[in-house]
């Protein structure tokens, strides 16, 4: 077996399963959140919720529109772990520790997380409140900012895994 992720959080969070998170070593290339607009896909719009796993499953299960992003993440599953698209809250955790995990990601042969603005925007699995049919949140690993974005735009994804003890 080879490494696929690096642990970046070992706390148990209220309302979240597991005992922390690990970030995948590599980005998923540009993917759209959804292949069409006008459909709420059943994800949370709560910016504080650690619900990326539930959100990604909701995206995958929506029959009225496909989620190329969720499908690409599900294609990663190996070694029994289940990767998913992080929520805004989970991306905030990763952002705060990115400078610490980057050397470990690189040692394992992965792509370091961006530390500056530029090519630093990643999809989250969190839809925008009251605009769920059209927009979801992007997260900047360069600045920690979030930006509402039409779901049909293609952006990078950095999956995470829940740690279960």
PLM-predicted stretches and their roles:
Residues 143-150:
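Carbohydrate-recognition loop of C-type lectin domains
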Residues 1-83, 120-121, 150-165:
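Extracellular adhesion/carbohydrate-recognition regions
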Residues 59-83, 88-141:
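An exposed tryptophan-centered "aromatic clamp" motif
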